[in-house]
Amino acid sequence: MVRCSCVLFRKYGNFIDNLRLFTKGGSGGMGYPRLGGEGGKGGDVWVVAHNRMTLKQLKDKYPQKRFVAGEGANSRVSALKGSKGKDCEIPVPVGVSVTDENGKIIGELNKEKDRLLVAEGGLGGKLLTNFLPLKGQKRVIHLDLKLIADIGLVGFPNAGKSSLLSKISHAKPAIADYAFTTIKPELGKIMYSDFKQISVADLPGLIEGAHMNKGMGHKFLKHIERTKQLLFVVDISGFQLSSQTHYRTAFETIILLSKELELYKEELHTKPALLAVNKMDLPDAQGKFHVLMNQLQNPKEFFHLFEKNMIPERTVEFQHIIPISAITGEGIDELKNCIRKSLDEHTNQENDAYHKKQLLNLHISNTVSYSEPPSKTAVSSPRMDIT
């Protein structure tokens, strides 16, 4: 019987994926009631996405984490219309979600130069405000980073994800023979001969209870949300976190990983998934792989090995299952080809769906335009009587 085990709490180290900031729009400028002059509007506070920015850089550069825009200029005889206050721009990494103090999403920045208004400047003094300026908006915001990658590596600690990433890309993650080698996300790119690039994210190892924020919990799982596809990486010989925890076979790790994703967010199961069975260079690996394939073909026949609360509602259906060895390089080329094929198929499906939607909208638009009754205000042609 498979049981949930207690796990250790870990930190990301120097990696930061959330930050709390105070923002304030600038106050408006004074109006000039005698001449009807209007004060300038206060500056706005914007969050702007930059590819080379990190939240740690932002925190180090602005340790006070306060961002206030400039005040609008007062109206005066030589300039009755006061100039607008200087805007304040907060540089953030691409992939940031911005929420307010109540957790309400203000917006997301998913590509370079995306901009989001987070605190508006106050109006300048004018007739409407009795020529008195208004204060700028005050707002506490939370920046939450979710990595954007084509492929997200999913697996228990020490499954060989970091070794695999270094083998298929130019990334150089920390690699060692103990659990939790990866304590912060690592990004790499697979380069193909036709110059196609596919980004891969190696995330800290998932553990049982991650959906309840155990271990790295939500810090790990939230990054999976923005990957296009998932690549499960399992050790063919199984996994055991420590001598105090239960040993898991390769099949058990797949089922438990699937359950953790399901409990965190069900739609993660809708993502296309591949499975890389690692460490095939070990003794008896071929025999264990044969057993694993049989179990994956008929997973429900083996659910009696699990506690009821650890059985997923639906099991992950892998598009490709590839036996590999990140050490010897066995199966690496096949894996890269399968990743490329799977992503290309997914892109084609998305494009087809988009074109069908556009055609449907066009058809509906044309149908509505043809069926519209004549306008009541339309002028009818004059009747001509021929005598």
Swiss-Prot record:
A single GO CC term for this protein reads:
mitochondrion
Nucleotide-binding among keywords: yes
Enumerate the residues binding GTP: 155-162, 202-206, 278-281
Query: What are the leading ranks of the lineage?
Result: Eukaryota, Metazoa, Chordata, Craniata, Vertebrata
Its keywords, alphabetically, are:
GTP-binding, Nucleotide-binding, Nucleus, Ribosome biogenesis
Q: Which gene encodes it?
A: GTPBP10
GO MF annotations, alphabetized: GTP binding; GTPase activity; magnesium ion binding
Provide the leader sequence positions: none
Q: Which InterPro entries match?
A: G_OBG (IPR031167), GTP-bd (IPR006073), GTP-bd_Obg/CgtA (IPR014100), GTP1_OBG_dom (IPR006169), GTP1_OBG_dom_sf (IPR036726), OBG_GTPase (IPR045086), P-loop_NTPase (IPR027417)
Compartments in which it is found: Nucleus, Nucleolus
Which family does the record claim for this protein? Belongs to the TRAFAC class OBG-HflX-like GTPase superfamily. OBG GTPase family.
Main site of residence?
nucleus
Q: Which residues form the Obg domain?
A: 13-148
Q: Which Pfam families match?
A: GTP1_OBG, MMR_HSR1
Q: Name one GO biological process term.
A: ribosome biogenesis
Give the protein's biological function. Answer: May be involved in the ribosome maturation process.
- Entry protein name: GTP-binding protein 10
Boundaries of every OBG-type G domain copy: 149-344
